UniProtKB/Swiss-Prot annotation:
Its cofactor is FAD; heme; Mo-molybdopterin. The gene is NIA1. Signal peptide: none annotated. PANTHER family: SULFITE OXIDASE, MITOCHONDRIAL, SULFITE REDUCTASE. It catalyses: nitrite + NAD(+) + H2O = nitrate + NADH + H(+). This is Nitrate reductase [NADH], clone PBNBR1405. Mo-molybdopterin binds at residue 191. PROSITE patterns: CYTOCHROME_B5_1, CYTOCHROME_B5_2, FAD_FR, MOLYBDOPTERIN_EUK. Its EC number is 1.7.1.1. FAD binds at residues 706-709, 723-728, 735, 740-742, 793. Residues 1-68 are annotated as: Disordered. Heme binds at residues 574, 597. CDD domains: cyt_b5_reduct_like, eukary_NR_Moco. Residues 49-62 have a biased composition (Basic and acidic residues).
Length: 911
């Protein structure tokens, strides 16, 4: 989404000069989008100076008649901008951005966030987008950010032009606007992922859930890329100049750390018919931070992913860009290619799958999702008007839009509204709107309404969805379903359902159909008795407010992909402890569940499914509004919490807490200690000993969560420390891509923000030998502490707590297994404690591969190792604490501890 410095007036919307094709730019002082709104500072944009006198043939030469005509159209577009902004509310700082790098950006609160808090990826609600018409207000323009928004200053920004050019240059913003002719015209931008959620409802792609509003239109002003390249003396094709690469300013994690970059063919860059510009104004204002202030690339008719924001470098090269995002994004791979195959067989690097130009697409926007059309004497006297948008790529004009009410048997041609004038080469860069009047009684008898568009090349939309790994370029017929309902007073009506709702919002007919399909697979006999997909009574339907009531250990329900699961009987068996379920009880936890669970876990979940979520928007539950009195209390989390006497960060285990990376220390070649600042300097984390947290990040556009135990003390103020073993790619042959989450913080710059969530876990050490395990007290004065690899961190946490209390006399016996001696984590701290407290802590190591002179055990943890180094199992005297790989727990610890007298169910506590 775009940011607006304020809901401003437009004193700079002056008539275009010299035909609207070649302008001199005369803006007055304007606020810098990079500055805090409370600061009274401004950027002095130069007034008209001598525009570079390029030769006539270098210019966009046009006749006087064309110039005059274009002049009128630019004025017309500017009137549209004013009209579009007439009922736009001011933007504001958003509380969701407070602890991210984007906290300084003003945004429109109505934007639907698609990837959580950060990075900011958003689209406007579809009705709101269409309400503003042909020109989209900047704050409602869709936003695709791969990371944090760079802070930029107009006065010191420059764009480097280098590579195969005779005169490399660093062009300042002043030079761009004063030394080159400017151009101004409307362009529709579309994300290649527009309508992706429809694909995700069929089969999950690797992309997040764009709805059908990943499209927006603005009036852009900038300088021609071809003019800039000519000024710098771009080489000919024979001289090797085949590609023009663009690089932005943001720091991103992809490929181990990079900028966002991509490229286009040089002949495209130099083609005057393509109108490619380096834009610095949008809808009559300087660009806003979310849209690339101070300068970005605009390539009309292309996908948004080629239009690099915060442009810093233009490089002319023989080869296309080698940037990570050029290859690992914006591709349409064959439908059979899954998430593993592209890396194994180099599919990413095959040129035939790259996306450049947009394809033909259309969407129904009226009726809206869950809109109800009453059927009565008044409404049946006049037709109902269906409406929507359509666009195509490459400058092709949309020539026809058709609607069917009978599944494609017959089609009605719609009325088209093209509100743009083509450029002098006949190219159309913007969406058009369509409408069709239909009889209400025809809608009543229809089961669905579908639309398809055609362009001047007679390209049209396929009937069925074509799934691809990245979920790109979805342009199948857009279908809405109709159902008869009874809105009030005994009337009947038609309720319309769109296929999906953007982001993680529930609803849409595709969710219902998927539920029916899964139910039919589980109960084959249903297929014979179910006449329509909306009559399936096999699954009970529940409202969201009903689900919210089941948010305690007595009754724990969750929602995943629109299905409702009763996890109450699984609380005691959950490997991550009951808290991992309870913090999500009564909520839709689709994103969190997908981020941390395997396919096996997803299949296991089906045993607990009890019904489906009602997605029509009606709620028959008691009033839960402010006026509902005590009913509001039903929404409160059931997890018992003591009122905090200190300022703690983890107040609510259901909420994410942003933390900033402030220090990174290399302990070994693959082990890092990361220090994160808590939101407030006087805060403690508030994590009970024995519990852990989730570290949350959006990686490659998907939420990723991993459990970690801090190594900082529980009373540390203002920060937490995490010791993480980094599993690098191309090290282990079984895992060529390495660890997704472990590599992520290592690739981040200081100052980057991640989220944490917790406390989680079923074990809590309460001090002096006392534990609380899944709500049951346990006691021991001797602890067998058994760890493998990174599993030492929860053990470390308990040791740290015990040794910090002089009156805690609990004896600890640690056996710590690793592959090699170099893999031993926090060894210095462990041995320091063992030396200082020899009567309270004893350490023994086991390594699979030992160096010469190794003083400890070699191989694996065996019964002999345990008998020699940990106490026997005695009821009320000893407990075993363990954390490590499942094979170690299952084959090395459980059978051998049982031989030593431990009750595996009661005396072995597994973190």
């Amino acid at each position: 989404m775009a940011t607006s410095v304020d809901n401003r007036h437009y004193p700079r919307l002056s008539s275009a000069l010299n035909g609207g094709v070649v302008h001199s730019f005369k803006p007055p002082l304007v606020p810098s989008p990079s500055l805090d709104r409370d600061q009274d500072q401004s950027v002095n944009v130069p007034t008209e100076k001598s525009v570079d006198k390029t030769t006539k043939e270098d210019r966009f030469d046009s006749s006087d008649d064309e110039d005059e005509s274009h002049n009128r159209y630019v004025s017309y577009y500017k009137e549209m901008v004013l009209k579009s902004n007439s009922d736009l509310e001011p933007t504001a700082l958003d509380s969701r951005d407070e602890s991210t790098g984007d906290k300084w950006i003003h945004r429109n609160s109505s934007m639907v966030r698609l990837t959580g808090k950060h990075p900011f990826n958003a689209e406007a609600p579809l009705p709101r987008l269409m309400h503003h018409g042909f020109i989209t207000p900047v704050p409602l323009h869709y936003v695709r950010n791969h990371g944090g928004v760079p802070k930029a200053e107009w006065s010191d920004w420059s764009v480097e032009v280098t590579g195969l050019v005779k005169r490399p240059a660093g062009l300042t913003m002043e030079q761009l606007i004063s030394e080159f002719p400017s151009r101004e015209f409307p362009v529709t931008l579309v994300c290649a992922g527009n309508r992706r959620k429809e694909q995700n409802m069929v089969k999950q792609t690797i992309g997040f859930n764009w709805g059908s509003a990943g499209v927006s239109t603005s009036l852009w002003r900038g300088v021609a890329l071809s003019d800039v390249l000519r000024r710098c003396g771009v080489y000919s094709k024979r001289g090797g100049a085949l590609n023009v690469c663009f690089e932005g300013a943001e720091d991103l994690p992809g490929g181990g750390g990079s900028k966002y970059g991509t490229s286009i063919k040089k002949e495209m860059a130099m083609d005057p018919a393509r109108d490619i510009i380096l834009a610095y104004m949008q809808n009559g204002e300087l660009l806003t931070p979310d849209h690339g202030f101070p300068v970005r690339v605009i390539i009309p008719g292309f996908i948004g992913g080629r239009m690099v924001k915060w442009l810093k470098r233009i490089i002319v090269t023989p080869q296309e860009s080698d940037n990570y995002y050029h290859y690992k994004d914006n591709r349409v791979l064959p439908s059979y290619v899954d998430a593993e195959l592209p890396n194994e067989e180099s599919w990413w690097y095959r040129p035939e799958y790259i996306i450049n130009e947009l394809n033909i697409n259309s969407v129904i926007t009226t009726p809206g999702h869950e809109e109800i059309l009453p059927i009565n004497a008044f409404t049946t006297q006049k037709p109902y008007t269906l409406k929507g948008y359509a666009y195509s790529g490459g400058g092709k004009k949309v020539t026809r839009v058709e609607v069917t009410l009978d599944g494609g048997e017959t089609w009605s041609v719609c009325e088209l509204d093209h509100q743009e004038k083509p450029n002098k080469y006949g190219k159309f860069w913007c969406w058009c709107f369509w409408s069709l009047d239909v009889e209400v009684l025809d809608l009543l008898s229809a089961k669905e309404v579908a639309v398809r568009a055609w362009d001047e090349s007679l390209n049209t939309q396929p009937e069925k969805l074509i799934w691809n790994l990245m979920g790109m370029m979805n342009n199948c017929w857009f279908r809405i379903k109709t159902n008869v309902c009874k809105p009030h007073r005994g009337e009947i009506g038609i309720v319309f359902e769109h296929p999906t709702r953007p982001g993680n919002q529930s609803g849409g007919w595709m969710a219902k159909e998927r539920q029916i399909e899964k139910s039919s697979e589980s109960h084959p006999t249903l297929k014979k008795s179910v006449s329509t997909p909306f009559m399936n009574t096999a699954s009970k339907m529940y409202s969201m407010s009903e689900v919210r009531k089941h948010n305690s250990a007595e009754s724990a329900w969750i929602i995943v992909h629109g299905h409702i699961y009763d996890c109450t009987r699984f609380l005691k068996d959950h490997p991550g402890g009951s808290d991992s379920i309870l913090i999500n009880a009564g909520t839709d936890c689709t994103e969190e569940f997908e981020a941390i669970h395997s396919d096996k876990a997803k299949k296991l979940l089906e045993d607990y499914r009890i019904g489906e979520l009602i997605t029509t928007g009606y709620d028959s539950s008691p009033n839960v509004s402010v006026h509902g009195g005590s009913s509001v209390m039903s929404l409160l989390a059931p997890i018992r919490q003591l009122a905090p006497t200190k300022n703690i960060a983890l107040v609510n285990p259901r909420e994410k807490v942003p933390v900033k990376l402030i220090e990174k220390t290399s302990i070994s070649h693959d082990v890092r200690r990361f220090r994160f600042a808590l939101p407030s300097e006087d805060q403690q984390l508030g994590l009970p000993v024995g519990k852990h947290i989730f570290l949350c990040a959006t990686i490659n556009d998907k939420l990723c969560l991993r459990a970690y135990t801090p190594t900082s003390t529980v009373d540390a103020v203002g920060y937490i420390d995490l010791v993480i073993k980094v599993y690098f790619k191309n090290v282990h042959p079984r895992f060529p891509n390495g660890g997704l989450m472990s590599q992520h913080p290592d690739s981040l710059p200081i100052g980057a923000v991640l989220d944490i969530k917790g406390p989680l876990g079923h074990i809590e050490y309460q001090g002096r030998g006392k534990f609380m395990v899944s709500g049951k007290p346990k006691f021991a004065n001797k602890l067998a502490m058994l760890a493998g690899g990174t599993g030492i961190t929860p053990i470390y946490q308990v040791i740290q707590s015990i040794l910090s209390d002089p009156e805690d006399e609990t004896e600890m016996f640690v056996v710590y297994a690793n592959r090699t001696e170099d893999d031993i984590l926090v060894r210095e701290e462990l041995e320091g404690w063992a030396s200082k407290f020899p009567d309270r802590l004893k350490i023994w190591y086991v390594v699979e591969i030992a160096k010469e002179g190794w003083e400890y055990s070699t191989g694996f943890i065996t019964e002999a190792v345990l008998r020699e180094h940990v106490p026997e199992g005695l009821e009320g005297e000893s407990l075993a604490l363990a954390c490590g790989p499942p094979p170690m727990i299952q084959f090395a610890l459980q059978p051998n501890l049982e031989k030593m007298g431990y009750d595996i169910k009661e005396d072995l506590l597994i973190f």
